[in-house]
Amino acid sequence: MGPQHLSPMQLLCLLGAISSLPWAEALLCYEATSSLFRAVGLHRWQWFLLRSMVCKLNEGCEETLVFIEAGTRKGILGFKGCSPASSYPPQVSYLVSPPGLSIASYSRVCRTYLCNNLTNMNAILHLKARTPKTLKSSSHSCPTCVGEHSKSCLPNFVSSESCPRDATKCYSSTVKFQAGFLNTTFLLMGCAREHTSVFAHFHHIGSIRVTEVINIVEKALFTGAGTPCRSPSWGILLGLLFAFKG
């Protein structure tokens, strides 16, 4: 049997089918990170879209945001970039629900040109608006902070805050988020329902790799305006933090 020749019409149809395949062309996606712990305002926060990147074949565009709240202290961490994961619609939920320390996340993977274009916290705001408010407080209080240990969570910046009635355990851990250019280590301290790791079941949030080490720090180290950094326990904690950053 001789070679088969395609007619011009058949060739055009074949080329059109090939060009329509989702993996026939690499995507262009926004590239960005966020790591904010000071003056966090959900209504004012804006994610600037200043850079883009060309993804590998079969990769999609991802955007993942994590909002952490402990008493009056807050943090926003995020990642935009390429992802090998299958596409999924926006997923907004509490990883750890209030009362007490809470962690909310937004994540999605899409496969159209610069589709990871989220610039605000509206999805998290809507989630918080649907969550019942905790009004009853207890007589317990805990040292509270969310932030980098060398900046917003220096010993003198850690405050003691009253706990909700159903979250009276004092929690402290060192957390590391890694994804693309995002590489942030921070302290997470506040009132919680349990002493166990809040990220025990969340080693990845989208493409963000999460590592957590529980800290054992005496609450007394943070009361008053003394010099807790001279305490052996505080020195051990700082040593762990520097080792964790490496």
UniProtKB/Swiss-Prot annotation:
Principal location: membrane
Keywords for this protein: Cell membrane, Glycoprotein, GPI-anchor, Lipoprotein, Membrane, Repeat, Signal
Lipidation (GPI-anchor amidated alanine): A225
All residue ranges annotated as the UPAR/Ly6 domain in the record: 142-223
Topology versus the membrane: Lipid-anchor; GPI-anchor
Residues the record marks as carrying a glycan: N117
Coiled coil stretches, renumbered: none
GO cellular component, one term: plasma membrane raft
Location in or out of the cell: Cell membrane
InterPro entries according to UniProt: Fert-Immune_med_protein, LY6_UPA_recep-like, Snake_toxin-like_sf
Propeptide feature: residues: 226-246
Signal sequence, renumbered to the chain: 1-26
Name this protein carries in UniProt: Ly6/PLAUR domain-containing protein 4
Organism (species): Bos taurus (Bovine)
Source lineage: Eukaryota, Metazoa, Chordata, Craniata, Vertebrata
